[in-house]
A protein has these predicted regions:
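C-terminal reverse transcriptase regions that engage the nucleic-acid substrate
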Residues: 5, 119-235
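RNase H-like nuclease fold core
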Residues: 235-256
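A short acidic-Thr-Gly-centered motif at the start of a beta-strand
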Residues: 47-54, 229-238
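Short, conserved micro-motifs composed of acidic
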Residues: 103-126
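Conserved beta-strand elements of beta-rich interaction domains across eukaryotes
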Residues: 1, 69, 74-75, 132, ...
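Flexible helix-coil linker/hinge segments at domain or subdomain boundaries
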Residues: 24-28, 92-107
Length: 256
């Protein structure tokens, strides 16, 4: 369905399904006909890093029509329980055609995607356009996506102007990729946002030397993160080791 075609009330329904899944984790549920698509092979080798965790945690998130489940409890019994909670929880709000009698539409849980192993429990998984490594706590872009972004940036450096609507699409792609996957990447977008400010609809953006320099920097950074995944600790800052009142009116690092 995608973000643009999703009415606001759909997100309310998907969030409700997420809440139902959270509660169903506490309940023993019957088998679901699709659960075997999600469960790993009984002999699959699980990452040692995750098995050694002392405290376990379950996380369920909904992004428009995508449901994301995360856990560090890798016992098969828990994966079965989590899988059933997700399947039954989604079907409790978005019921299958066999219940509603609806004809001509797609089922709420895509069997085709499950057959492509998109729902399989894995510690390395592509989620919302990013490859997440739950054992090593890293994040990176798929190689094909990096190559496509680099090709776009190289083309931009050869142009003098570009239509606003095309520039907006490129800026959105770059922002999704750089602001989330490059430490401090947001700081490179000041000139990009400034270039669009005040530009009339259906207007053109002049690709100045400053913009082209930023494109060169981004191209180099994307090449670097493609070779070395980014640790999530670099993206989400922790609290400082020492913090307190810096002066009488401002709270920050340092103190007297």
């Amino acid at each position: 369905m995608g973000w643009c075609e999703s009415p606001p009330f759909f997100c309310a329904a998907s969030e409700m399904a997420r809440d139902v899944i959270q509660q169903l984790l506490k309940v023993d549920l019957p088998p679901h006909p699709f659960e075997h698509y999600m469960l790993p092979d009984a002999n699959a080798t699980l990452p040692k890093e995750a098995q050694d965790l002392a405290n376990t945690m379950d996380l369920i998130e909904a992004f428009v029509d995508d449901f994301i489940g995360c856990t560090d409890n890798l016992t098969r019994s828990h994966l079965v329980k989590f899988t059933r909670a997700m399947m039954h929880g989604m079907h409790s709000i978005f019921q299958p055609p066999s219940v509603t009698g609806h004809k001509g539409g797609d089922p709420p849980i895509s069997k085709k995607k499950l057959e492509q192993l998109e729902g399989l429990w894995e510690h390395v998984k592509e989620i919302l356009g990013w490859i997440l490594d739950g054992a090593n706590y890293t994040i990176r872009l798929p190689e094909k996506k990096v190559e496509k972004i680099q090709a776009t940036l190289r083309q931009l450096r050869k142009k003098k102007t570009i239509p606003l609507n095309e520039f907006q699409k490129i800026a959105g792609t770059l922002h999704h990729a750089a602001s989330m996957g490059i430490p401090g990447g947001r700081g490179l977008f000041t000139a990009i946002w400034s270039a669009m400010k005040g530009c009339q609809k259906n207007g053109w953006i002049k690709l100045t030397p400053d913009l082209k320099a930023i494109f060169s920097d981004l191209c180099w950074l994307f090449r670097e993160i493609a070779n070395k995944p980014i640790n999530v600790a670099q993206l989400v800052p922790n609290l400082p080791h020492c913090h307190g009142y810096a002066d009488a009116c401002k709270y920050g690092a340092g103190g007297v």
